[in-house]
Amino acid sequence: MESGSMKTPLVNNQEEARSSSSITCGLLLSTSVAVTGSFVYGCAMSYSSPAQSKIMEELGLSVADYSFFTSVMTLGGMITAAFSGKIAAVIGRRQTMWIADVFCIFGWLAVAFAHDKMLLNIGRGFLGFGVGLISYVVPVYIAEITPKAFRGGFSFSNQLLQSFGISLMFFTGNFFHWRTLALLSAIPCGIQMICLFFIPESPRWLAMYGRERELEVTLKRLRGENGDILEEAAEIRETVETSRRESRSGLKDLFNMKNAHPLIIGLGLMLLQQFCGSSAISAYAARIFDTAGFPSDIGTSILAVILVPQSIIVMFAVDRCGRRPLLMSSSIGLCICSFLIGLSYYLQNHGDFQEFCSPILIVGLVGYVLSFGIGLGGLPWVIMSEVFPVNVKITAGSLVTVSNWFFSWIIIFSFNFMMQWSAFGTYFIFAGVSLMSFVFVWTLVPETKGRTLEDIQQSLGQLS
């Protein structure tokens, strides 16, 4: 859900090699290892949903305590996200993923063996450090190893594995104790740590440090022995040199009229993605079913079943349907489904209609998950990689990523308190935000499908 809950950074997609646009075993292996991190992210994001009731009961946590435990991961993510671009640039993409796994393993172990809220929060915070790095480096790595012809679908494999992690946590959380669940969640981190030794470093990162021989060997591994990688290698070198010349701008250069439109798009989509309530659904799904009087084990299992197929469909649709239609359809769907969820809570207080509450809730939540997945779940990050000029990409990427984590923290921390205030009112607010998202996309977000980065950025600069 997150996306997003998981967070795709700003990368330069200008290189394209006509002779190397094929899918090879090396490319599939490297992508599979990288998106294991996305799976870890999905597990971490949704762990708090099935674990909530037992953790609160066994450790004697209040609603405020558990809200902080759930949201502290986003604070940790916000910290490392602010430096993730620099870290990945200095030590490399693979090494950054390896460090993220170390953080996550420590975090899961701390949660599993916690006997008080302090160690519980420390563990959740370390998970945040790990997924904050993952949210940046995994999409960067995939974008930099994938031929342009397949980049949209491969980039959405992020969303697919996040959804798979969320689904697995929703489903297995019905059968395992929360401590066992935390220990099991550390296993994918260890698997990725080992497998990272068997995949190549990003070709662009190698070019940045002048490692020409390794660059060519890596491209051969990714494109196949029969692939002609000379043109692609030359374009990577040219793009890296251009980035080196033009990326000296800082935060001051981001905030000027030329970049006003891209900045509004970036921050606006991040705010709307979170304020429609997506992080709350992932983090508190079981609690939502419980408070609505529907069995949480059945409800979360239903969500688990639909998440992965939905992500597979979107992965193949993103380069065919266009960004704007999917975003606007997603926004309208979220508006309708949030209203239905709110209506189910409202009807609980009216005896004549209580038998309709559970069916309306299920339809609303299933529709919400489907609607979020087709647009606002992953597409804001795809668009972010396309709208910012080269000279502010790193700065803009850090700002947008940190903003997304911050907006996510606001929703996750405040959700339980909002539900205590008014359950139906909370979802009516989410419905209103989703409607605002439709208007925002309709008026401000351009269609980027099939356009070059130069064309997109030039048109946005003229409008600013």
UniProtKB/Swiss-Prot annotation:
The chain crosses the membrane at residues 23-43, 72-92, 95-115, 125-145, 156-176, 180-200, 263-283, 298-318, 326-346, 359-379, 399-419, 424-444. Its main location: membrane. Disulfide bonds: none annotated. The keyword Transmembrane helix applies. Pfam families: Sugar_tr (PF00083). SUPFAM superfamilies: MFS general substrate transporter. InterPro entries: MFS_dom, MFS_ERD6/Tret1-like, MFS_sugar_transport-like, MFS_trans_sf, MFS_Trehalose_Transporter, Sugar/inositol_transpt, Sugar_transporter_CS. Sugar transporter. Belongs to the major facilitator superfamily. Sugar transporter (TC 2.A.1.1) family. This is Sugar transporter ERD6-like 1.
